[in-house]
Amino acid sequence: KDELYEVDFLRHLYKKVAQSNVLIVNHAFLAQESLRKQPLLPESPWLIIDEAHHLPDIASRMASERVNSVILKKQVTHFIEKEQLFVALQQIFQQFSEEQRFVKIYQQGLLDFVDEWQDFLFELHRLFSKTQKRIDHQELLLTKERIDYLSAAGEKHSQTLQLLLQELLTIQSKLQQTIMSQLETFSLADRIVFVRLFQFFDEIERIHHCFTIYLDDWRPRWVKEYLPQNEDHGLIEIHDLEASLLPETKWYPRYERIIYTSGTLKFGNNKKYLPQRLGLTEVTFKTLPTPYNYAENARVYVPEEAVAIQNASSYEMGQYISDTIEKLMAQEERSMLVLFTSHELLSTVYHQVQPRLLEKGQEVLAQGISGSREKILKRFSNGKPNVLLGADSFWEGVDLPGTALQLLIVTRLPFENPKRPLVQAKYAYLEAEGIQPFAQEAVPKAALRLRQALGRLIRSEEDRGALLILDRRLVTAKYGKRLIKVFPKGLSVKEAPMPEILEELKEFLNK
């Protein structure tokens, strides 16, 4: 036993876990229980899942797998050339002639696999190029109908890849058996090499799992994407549309009672949306009254001048958003969070508004441009009036109470992009299940995200803030009324000209 065994940090952690009455983990750690060979979390009478509205998307994200040809080639090259892993294994197995032979075969198999992989991607690239002019750096959906037109060469490469993977897995199993059965005879240095080797073995198993599903499993639950970088490099990716169905996970039966908590568990009076996404049929729902007086402390406006989203170009939309930001900052001189659904539009607005506000001594911070999320939030909350342009994670998890944030702009209703192949595939899957994609998935999901955006403003009973939604579909579209229902009772949405909104804001925010 190693002299540091008793103070090993991982053993210390597991010991603390075994002694604890309460364990706190994030959603991703919980979702990964279904992917682990052995569970890391103990069985328990109780499981409490806070911010449970995140669970479906996180479970789906954790179940997604990808193989990147560039990263794969770098990994293999790194192990063979830089780390000299297989040279070290040959030395370790000096007394094991059979294992030395396996190591040589395994190393050559890896090199052959990388070459075949590039050849397969070349044929996959040709397959998509037949029907689409521009495919590099695009998200492309691989369907059964399309793969049936794969060339004979592509079919041969795919079969060779599967054979090579099977050979690699067989050798991995034999080497693991030898190592584990003779573990006490190997030195500490040898065991460190084995740790790196086993980590790589796990990666090959993952690639095998991903590739097998990508080519052979055509159940509706699986969505396959091809993301080419050039002719012989790219990514393949699989997504499991049923990953969020909790009764099918490995961890769900290990808990007797599960409590799901969140400020956005329901959509208006609809309490079925989240349970349906999680595959739950029998749930007891309890709604607690909010401690916040939204009618008194919050306002929601839709400017009458807002441009028609459907007809506006990205430049026109960017110009309108920039003008709105400038007008608000000229009057209020308060920090403002502006939320986007498109990084392209965010960048357009940044480059339009940043020079204008900089002349007035006001800083504009933008996600993906001004540094890391943590760095941006730190600069944003420094007490000086500035503007933060954000997307994705900035819609939630931003905690800026009091006067740190009193103005929030939503540039566009937060619907998923229906042109994305993954979204199209998900909607087709839901339709096949008898679910109306727009009414029963897109609208509720957008509504809950809108509610989360409002939650950035009111973080305590003393907070005051105003939300401007620059998308007139909220008040003109038929589904707008359904979206509005997600806001707390007593909080109405007012449509008014921008000068009137500015006048009301002056009085409201300076109370």
Regions found by a protein language model. Name each.
Residues 1-511:
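ASCE RecA-like P-loop NTPase motor cores
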